[in-house]
Curated annotation (Swiss-Prot):
Pfam families: Fer4, Fer4_4
Family matches, as PANTHER family: FORMATE HYDROGENLYASE SUBUNIT 2-RELATED, OXIDOREDUCTASE
4Fe-4S ferredoxin-type domain segment(s): 2-31, 41-72, 73-102, 140-172
Cofactor(s) in the UniProt record: [4Fe-4S] cluster
Enzyme Commission designation: 1.-.-.-
Entry function: Probable electron transfer protein for hydrogenase 4.
Residue positions binding [4Fe-4S] cluster 2: 22, 146, 149, 158
Amino-acid positions noted as binding [4Fe-4S] cluster 1 in the UniProt annotation, renumbered to this chain: 12, 15, 18, 162
Cofactor note: Binds 4 [4Fe-4S] clusters.
Designated name of the protein: Hydrogenase-4 component A
Length: 205
């Protein structure tokens, strides 16, 4: 099975530490510094949104240039191959892939930037607020998604940075251990006076 990071909304305080850690570690590696996870907020909870590294990943299936592949028990994106078509972001069921525009493009001489006063008058279009439709002349859009910090032997930076342990890396072995522990809790449910295993505190889990 693929590895992935799971988020626990009940423990998340929305401090943005995970986003900062993700951005910093990728910038250090010379990759897009846009965070590989997002923070979704409602009136009651704050939850990190992270790539699930799906077994039958739709993003992998739609990429026209094979920039997305399955390797090392994860779904990985090769930024150097990405053409910025954004199909992967459109089909992701979790909204875990975003578009970043921080890599300059070497434009042909005839397309070099002109001063604003030299441009022909024309109808102005209001800038879009939709992240997938935004663009900037002279900058190439590149998709960014969680790579589980595969360049770090210690694993994802977001998991290690979270002060509340709201993020955890799930592997095949750890999933098996958790399943066995939850089976044990379920079996002892009646013996414990009917206490719901899902109501256990973080320490008890």
């Amino acid at each position: 099975m693929n590895r992935f990071v799971v988020a626990e909304p009940l423990w998340c305080t929305g401090c943005n530490t995970c986003l900062a850690a993700c951005s910093d570690v990728h910038k250090t590696q010379g990759l897009q510094q846009h965070p590989r996870l997002a923070l979704a907020k409602t009136s009651t909870i704050t939850a990190p949104v992270v790539c699930h590294h799906c077994e039958e990943a739709p993003c992998l299936q739609v990429c026209p240039v094979n920039a997305i592949s399955q390797r090392d028990d994860a779904i990985q994106l090769n930024e150097s191959l990405c053409i910025g078509c954004k199909l992967c972001a459109v089909v992701c069921p979790f909204g875990a892939i975003s578009a970043s525009g921080s890599r300059p493009v070497n434009a042909h001489a005839q397309y070099v930037f002109q001063a604003e006063g030299s441009l022909k008058d024309g109808e102005e279009n209001a800038p879009t607020q939709h992240a997938l439709l935004r663009w900037e002349p002279g900058v190439q859009t590149v998709a960014v998604k969680c790579d589980l910090c595969d360049f770090l032997p210690e694993g994802p930076a977001c998991v290690r940075a979270c002060p509340n342990q709201a993020l955890r890396l799930i592997t095949g072995d750890s999933l098996q251990r958790q399943m066995k522990e939850k089976q044990r809790l379920a079996a002892s449910w009646f013996a414990n006076g009917g206490e719901d295993p899902l109501s256990l505190t973080q320490e008890q889990r």
